[in-house]
Amino acid sequence: VVALVAVQSPSYLELRGRVTEVSKSLIPRVVIYSVDCGDVRVRFDALSKLLRLNTGDEVVITVSKEKPNYTKGVDYVAWGYVVGLRSGDRVGKVIISLWGYVVILESANTELLKLFNYMDRVYFKVSKLGT
């Protein structure tokens, strides 16, 4: 498993991982991605025309309170709000709404919950490695 928490600060989280599942949503043209980043699992949905990943692809996921540097037309970047912080069942979850699209960060390490507050405005970036 490729996993690395590269940067972790009060306003920035960067994770490296591998896409483990790509599935169709019940909503037309929406795809659900699952990414294993070791200590953190990330699940998110995106419009299929905007982001095309395959099982096995290596990605870097950034969640930041500041607009991250990105390459237009290559990286996927969206912004939204932290709408849920949950701890229970030995797993902490950060839930982010990107104007209807959802990102869920899950980790047994509940320190993840301390990085964000309810209704923080955050940017979500996905960069495919090796492109």
Regions found by a protein language model. Give the residues of each.
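Mixed-charge, low-complexity intrinsically disordered regions
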Residues: 2-81, 87-131
